[in-house]
Amino acid sequence: MHMPGHKGAGILGFEGMDLTEIYGADELFAAEGIIKESEQNASNLFGCPTYYSTQGSTLCIQTMCTILCQDAKSKGKKPKILAGRNAHRSFIHAAALLDFDIEWLYGNSDYLSCKIHAEDLEKAIIESHPTAVYLTNPDYLGNLLDIQSLASVCKKHNVLLAIDNAHGAYLRFLEPSLHPIDLGADLCCDSAHKTLPVLTGGAYLHLSDSLNQVWKNDVKHFMEYFSSTSPSYLIMASLDAANEVLDTTFRNSLFECIQSVASLKNTLVQHGYTILSGEPMKITISTKEFGYTGNEIANHLMECDIYPEFYDSDYIVLMPSPYNTKDDLKRLETCLCGIERKPILINKPPKLEQSKKAMNVRQALFSSSITLDVSKSLGQVCSSVTVSCPPAILPVIPGEVISESSIEVMKYYGIETVRVVKE
């Protein structure tokens, strides 16, 4: 006589596995039994203290930011995080909730990639004196940073390095590992569900062995700040079941899949496609060199009953996994190679200039706001996360003044309205 209301007898067929926090089922944020044992198994697989999230990397990012803030305050400093401009919206929302300052890193290359090098990071640390650094690796397009050299810079200047590794849980199982914790990061989150055999919402929070033990002791407490009090046992069960797969068959399956994906990429290049270099398990096509927008290629794929992870005017992103069959990859090859190449499209994304800050993120997000047409927003202060596509660096951040440059970028990506601070 306890929750859930379906009593294990619902219409979908899996309700019997959907438990709640009854005797013997343990509690995610006060784990002493089977959940604690399962998380320890995951910790052994990743070589560091690892904790489950049933709310994706969003909960992990919020928790990492809490640790970064608490670490700064413990040293008598106001939290100020130096972050790559391609940070996920959950990082920006965390800034509003936790009231920390952000200094943005734009990188020194195309603004869509936010490629940050060690020398850029060191210069920024010296100039802005942050209490921590937060970077995304890999990004949505599959670009990889040199985490090892970036981590060395952070250690040299005694600032913590947190990595949003949402797209790279599988990197731990490469030879050699490219996982951020193995390369020197202090904190890291993985969206297990993105690249591993885990249900949507399943994620990991990893803490390095070198991180202050105080934060390891408090991590579950911090996670509770943002989490539902009813975490999904179905998602936890999938994280637990994945442990055995990761410990036994996954490395070999991943190796075979990487070889198949590499072969497919080579075939596509021979056909004339431009494939971005980066992580091995992501196929990112820069479509305009082939004479099409990403939207046009995506529509053709969907006519072949193949649904891409992402597409826009410039790119299409495909995310195979070891659980795609060889027939899946062959069907993808046949569909893409059935498209005839056309003259290159020369229109490129508009250049994004750095925006002027009028107030901090917290002030902007919690201000009274109104919605305006983008074309009428020049000079207004943005009050919401406006970007409509994951790969792009945000054209304007809450608290920044909307410029002609940011308006041009928003229009390019089809953003028609924007919320601004009410005057």
Label each PLM-derived region with a short phrase.
Residues 12, 37, 55-274:
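Conserved PLP-enzyme active-site core in the AAT-like
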Residues 77, 266-415:
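Conserved C-terminal alpha-helix-loop-beta "cap" of PLP-dependent enzymes
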Residues 1-16, 391-394, 422-423:
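N-terminal glycine-rich, Lys/His-bearing helix-loop that initiates the first secondary-structure elements
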Residues 51-53, 133-136, 316-321:
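Short glycine-rich or small-residue beta-strand-to-loop segments that form or flank ligand, phosphate
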Residues 15-59:
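Conserved N-terminal alpha-helix of the aminotransferase class I/II PLP-enzyme fold
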Residues 99, 415-423:
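Short, compositionally biased
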